[in-house]
From Swiss-Prot:
Motif (Peroxisomal targeting signal): 261-263
Keyword field contains Disulfide bond: no
Organism (species): Arabidopsis thaliana (Mouse-ear cress)
Protein name: Stress-response A/B barrel domain-containing protein UP3
Quaternary structure and interacting proteins, as annotated: Homodimer.
Gene: UP3
Domain Stress-response A/B barrel as annotated: residue spans: 49-142, 158-252
InterPro entries attached to this UniProt entry: Dabb, Dimeric_a/b-barrel, HS1/DABB1-like
Length: 263
């Protein structure tokens, strides 16, 4: 029998501890921490906050409950703080990870992200629809340059999410080099509609991954066309390879039911 216990913490408004057996406990922190000061958390208007959550549903999870989880998370788009939210199954996984679903949402500021996290409706969805059917969750948050026009990728567009865990003692200059290389990908690969990258500011929930990026393509064929340029792709990877310990790369399709608002 699985039990979920919610314990408010100073550094995290909602920490979930799921007991899978008598001897195994998995700490799943889905919600962003609220230890943001007004001065340090205010985000310039030229930037947005990216929020990614990866879920691993249980092997025996009922398909109707999985669909309910997706729909209930996407329904949170009505909250004032949410600029865009999309939850969907993973289309393809290019690394050794067992995650099955992803949520991507965007906010104007860290304060808005924290307010979304603490909202009773969000708490209810996590408690009732997410925790009972998931046995692993991780999340990353980063500040990114604002995307021109609407913040919402079109339904049917394809996203490639990349998370990097860096080697120990990587200098700040190297981190800037990594983010610079990733930002420049849109110039080298015209098939990329939009791309953002940044350093994760919620390390407690990220399993050691400290740099995240998300690139959107018009459709699967556009993404595959970029992937087919192996020599150019590998040349970009070589620029940062020496700094990287491990990666998670997943792809997903934006569902037609994803919700958003324009800036």
């Amino acid at each position: 029998m699985i039990c979920a216990r919610i314990r408010p913490l100073i550094s995290s408004p909602l920490a979930f501890t799921i007991s899978t057996t008598k001897h195994s406990r998995i700490n799943l922190r889905l919600l962003p921490r609220r230890s943001f000061s007004v001065m340090s958390s205010s985000t310039p208007q030229s930037q947005i906050i990216e929020h990614i959550v990866l879920f691993k549903t249980k092997d025996d999870a009922d398909s109707t409950k999985i669909t309910s989880m997706i729909n209930n998370l996407n329904a949170l788009a009505y909250l004032d703080q949410v600029l865009h939210i999309s939850t969907s199954p993973l289309h393809r996984i290019s690394s050794a990870t067992a995650f099955t679903h992803v949520l991507h949402s965007r906010y104007e500021s860290k304060e808005d992200l924290a307010s979304y996290a603490a909202h009773p409706d969000h708490v209810r969805v996590v408690k009732e629809s997410v925790l009972p059917i998931c046995d692993d969750i991780m999340a990353v948050d980063w500040i990114a340059d604002r995307i021109p026009g609407t913040v919402a990728p079109l339904p049917g567009s394809v996203a490639k999410l990349t998370l990097l865990k860096l080697k120990e003692d990587v200098a700040d200059e190297a981190k800037s080099e990594i983010t610079g290389v990733i930002k420049g990908l849109s110039e080298k690969f015209p098939g990329i509609d939009q791309i953002t990258v940044g350093e994760n500011f919620s390390p407690a929930r990220a399993k050691g991954f400290s740099i995240a990026s998300i690139a959107y393509f018009k459709d699967l064929s556009e993404m595959e066309a970029v992937d087919a340029q192996k020599e150019l792709v590998n040349s970009q990877k070589d620029k940062v390879r020496d700094y990287v310990d491990s990666t998670i790369v997943v792809e997903f399709v934006v569902p037609s039911s994803s919700q958003s608002s324009s800036l």
